[in-house]
Amino acid sequence: MLTKRTSEKTSPSGKKVLVTRAGDQATALTVALAEIGVDPVVVPTIEIIPPASFVELDQAIADLDQVDYLILTSANAVNAFFDRLVAQGRNPQALSAIQTVAVGPKSAEALFERGVTADLIPKDYRAEGVVALLKDRVSGKRLLYPKAALARDLIPTELTAAGAKVIAPVAYASAPPVDVAKKLQQALTDGLDLLTFTASSTVQNFVDLLDDQDLGLAKRIPVASIGPLTSATARELGFNVIIEPDNSTLEALVTAIRTYFSGTR
């Protein structure tokens, strides 16, 4: 979805676009934005941290021989799960008899880098896509879904209703980075043409990092959101979402941003 733009055709060149992804994940988006001519301004509003406890995840890893499907909904989930798998003395061969579900190409790529090829990738790169893909094939099956601390309950709820046993340990959490508020304020002062948000948590943390005056300034800047859930959060918090790609991928987001700045359809 791209809303209509009333201004004359312009060029992406020199436009300042805020990147709020986690520091170690911002590179791909930053490079892609630079390639279309914009000036990426990187101020992460989120960092990935360990969960409060690994007890549930460790138990799930110990019981891998009972698992039929492994659901990994992001590169963060892939990395958190495999880091813990290795810490527990296991290796990717432990997954050889398990059907792995990767939500989107980035998750599949992260999985491949760990030595595992995704067996299934839903057409819709969201929790809804996982449910649509699996609901008719998981009755009586045991599913492992290593999730983020603030993940929605859609996958466990819907697939349990479909007859599956869903184990959903928290594999990672997120938090606002320390000492980024001043950098964010400076970016706003210097001027930005577009804000990008790639998760609801990046939006909420952005809001939490700013005082009322700076937040008021920020809300006058148009927003590019990676997908409907992030867009809904941004709108609820008072932002003007004008870009949302049809597919929730970084590539689609960058293409939509280029289209927006070019004033073309």
Question: What residue ranges belong to the model's regions?
Answer:
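Signature of uroporphyrinogen-III synthase
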Residues: 1-265
